[in-house]
Amino acid sequence: MGYRCAIATALIALGAGTGAAQNIGKFVISDEAAKKTLFKNEINVETAEKLTQACVEFAKRNNQAVTVFILSPTGQIVHSYRMDGQVPINIETAELKAKSVLYTRDSSHARANQVANNLSLQMRWAALGVFPVSGGLPIIVDGQLIGAIGVGGGSKDEECAYTALTSVIGPQPALPPATPPAATPAPR
């Protein structure tokens, strides 16, 4: 029985392979469609460095020290910078904020608002590696996500990222408002 099953499986695989090879022409993309599939929109190092510098200048004006991570849409580090005085957790959270933007395709502050009063959702996001704390913003050009910026270490992380994006790339969508914490019922 096992021998017959193995032979049948091999024959099916062989038949599928030759059948698929005969139809390969149906799946070939050429001309303009091919150019579109090969073109990759991703933030370049030069722009990432400009964003970082603008963020560092903002931090200095506000007497803060920050860490900045710029990631590609696939999560690869394009540029990172740590100002003096940063502790390891600030460095880690800056990268986590940028990654969270890529996972959710939204600002990390928007995720913070979403989970503000929902412990169950906080736990689910955490299990997925999403860090719902403000300071991460998408980098969007012509409606296309080309990367993410994450800033950690200061009390104005999101403002730092936003200021950098508007000064280097241009006008950005408005930042989401903060969600106030749920009212705690008075003890009885």
Where does each model-flagged region fall?
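N-terminal secretory signal peptides that target proteins for export/translocation
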Residues: 1-2
